[in-house]
């Protein structure tokens, strides 16, 4: 006669999903560890938005100056700049080329 055991694997899996749903995120940035509740969630979302372009091919939509639509801009670290118009050009000046006096 076979003895039926409770479905332990299913029970463990469902309990782990339940615990994960109500727990803190796995990684909390160091500067967010003193917060709780809404402040913790806001701090984590800010940290995710600040680092999104560092590790992924992240694109954001910004308002376009030429039209009423938006323009998609890549904020990936490895992306090239897409400046269409003239940009401000600043020439570097060596400190030895500038005359100054010490009083």
Swiss-Prot record:
Spans of biased composition, class Basic and acidic residues?
75-87
Q: What is this protein called?
A: Non-structural protein ORF3
Keywords, sorted A to Z: Host endoplasmic reticulum, Signal
Q: Which residues form the signal peptide?
A: 1-23
Query: Where in the cell is the protein located?
Result: Host endoplasmic reticulum
GO terms under cellular component? host cell endoplasmic reticulum
Where does the UniProt entry say this protein principally localizes?
A: host cell
Biased-composition ranges, Polar residues, are 65-74
What is the gene called? Answer: ORF3
In residue numbers, the region (Disordered) covers 65-89
Q: Does the record bear Nuclease in its keywords?
A: no
